[in-house]
């Protein structure tokens, strides 16, 4: 992988520990992550983690942004998008808001409202996009925040699992998805 400098194949030509069971699950070995060319990403190394071609109903990417790297529009007609800053900082905007995001920062952009970004230095991002499924009379809206500002809450009453919800989907049916981080006690699952 270009990320960990483990180049070549383990035992045989095209050998990998990654598993893709189309429409069921995907396990990607870090050694097998590759750079992809994805339109709109400039001065970025993009790894496709999931896509409709793999059987998913979404596309998600791990993006390593180099200094001055940018994207000219994440989303599309009917597509909702989410961007999370794993490391670094960048400027983001959509039709509704602009923000400076640092590590832990995120932006959710509703359908047909593209996200653009530009990095000041190196940054690592998680990007997710999918077709929005509307409920009559309800709609989603832009959400900007930072995981570092959210409290950990007990997940569904469990004593060993905690959640940080990024979107208000638990009480706003205009959101057809959620993004969150789960944290488990050691040995719990």
Model feature map: region roles:
Residues 1-3, 120-162:
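Double-stranded beta-helix
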Residues 82, 95-112:
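Short acidic-glycine-tyrosine-enriched beta hairpin
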Residues 33-73, 152-189:
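A short glycine-rich, His/Asp/Glu-containing loop-to-beta-strand
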């Amino acid at each position: 992988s270009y990320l960990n400098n483990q180049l070549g194949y383990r035992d045989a030509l095209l050998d990998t520990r990654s598993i893709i069971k189309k429409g069921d699950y995907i396990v990607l070995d870090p050694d097998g992550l590759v750079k992809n060319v994805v339109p709109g990403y400039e001065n970025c190394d993009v790894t496709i983690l999931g896509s409709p071609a793999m059987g998913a109903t979404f596309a998600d990417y791990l993006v390593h942004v180099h200094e001055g790297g940018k994207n000219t529009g994440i989303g599309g007609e009917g597509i909702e998008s989410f961007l999370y800053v794993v490391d670094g900082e960048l400027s983001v905007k959509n039709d509704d808001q602009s923000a400076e995001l640092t590590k832990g920062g995120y932006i959710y952009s509703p359908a047909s409202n593209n996200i653009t970004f530009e990095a000041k230095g190196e940054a690592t991002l998680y990007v997710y996009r999918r077709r929005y499924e509307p409920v009559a009379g309800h709609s989603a809206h832009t959400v900007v925040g930072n995981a570092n500002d959210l409290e950990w809450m007990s997940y569904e009453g469990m004593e060993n699992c905690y959640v940080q919800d990024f979107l208000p989907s638990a009480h706003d049916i205009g959101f057809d998805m959620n993004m969150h981080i789960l944290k488990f006690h050691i040995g719990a699952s």
